[in-house]
Amino acid sequence: MSKVLVLKSSILGGYSQSALLVDHLIGKWEDQGATITVRDLAGKDVLPMVDGEIASGLRGGAELTARQQEMLDLSNALVEELKANDTIVITAPMYNFNIPTQLKNWIDFVARAGVTFTYTENGPKGLVEGKRAVLITTRGGAHKDGPTDHIVPFLKTFLGFIGITDVEVVYGEALNMGPEANQKGISEAKQSLDALTV
C-alpha cells in the first residue's frame, strides 16, 4: 500500500485553489487505497520561522537550549515523516513570484547536512532516495516555462538536492484572469491529476 505525504501551503484556507486541487487528488488516491498524511503548513501545522538559534540547534550538539532541543526534535520528526512516505505531494501557490513562506519554513527544517543530504568529494549527494514528488502549483497569471516561474525550478532543485529526482508537475495557470480562464485552468489541472496513479 502506497504512503503519501501531502504538504498544503496556501494561506487562503477554504478559498485556496491549490487546496481544491490537492483535495481532488487525495480523494482519488484514497479510493485507490493509498494511506495519506496531510500536513497543513499554513494552518494547524504551521512551523516556526528558522532563526539563528534554531539553525544552530539543528546542527545538534551536547549543550542545546530547551528551545533548540524542541526544534531539533521537531526537525527529526519532519524528516522521519518525509522518509516514511513513498510519494510527497507539495502544493505551491505563487505568491509574488515565489513559494509561500510556510513552505520555505518546512524546507529549512528538513534540509540538513548529514541527515537529508551530504557533501562528498564529488559534490552533494541526496539521502532521501527512492521517492516520487508531485508539485501542484497554482498562479493567478500565466507563468509556465517562462522567466517569471521561479517556483518549479527552485523546488526541483531542492528536491533533487535531497535525492528526489522523480518529480511530476501539475499547473493551475491563469486562475485570476477571468472566470473562463479560471475554469479552464482548474479543469486542465484536474485532468492532469486524474492521469496520475498512486
UniProtKB/Swiss-Prot annotation:
Enzyme class, UniProt record, top EC level: oxidoreductase
HAMAP family per the UniProt record, alphabetical: Azoreductase_type1 (MF_01216)
Gene of this entry: azoR
Protein purpose: Quinone reductase that provides resistance to thiol-specific stress caused by electrophilic quinones.
Subunit composition and interactions: Homodimer.
Keyword NAD: yes
SUPFAM superfamilies xref list: Flavoproteins
Name of the protein: FMN-dependent NADH:quinone oxidoreductase
GO MF: electron transfer activity; FMN binding; oxidoreductase activity, acting on NAD(P)H as acceptor; oxidoreductase activity, acting on NAD(P)H, quinone or similar compound as acceptor
Record EC number: 1.6.5.-, 1.7.1.17
Cofactor section: FMN
Assigned keywords, A-Z: Flavoprotein, FMN, NAD, Oxidoreductase
InterPro entries per record: Flavodoxin_fold, Flavoprotein-like_sf, FMN-dep_NADH:Q_OxRdtase_AzoR1, NADH:quinone_OxRdtase_FMN_depd
Lineage per the UniProt record: Bacteria, Pseudomonadati, Pseudomonadota, Gammaproteobacteria, Alteromonadales
Residues noted as binding FMN in the record, renumbered to the chain: 10, 16-18, 94-97, 138-141
Reaction(s) catalysed by this chain's protein: 2 a quinone + NADH + H(+) = 2 a 1,4-benzosemiquinone + NAD(+); N,N-dimethyl-1,4-phenylenediamine + anthranilate + 2 NAD(+) = 2-(4-dimethylaminophenyl)diazenylbenzoate + 2 NADH + 2 H(+)
Cofactor note: Binds 1 FMN per subunit.
Family label: Belongs to the azoreductase type 1 family.
Domain of life (superkingdom): Bacteria
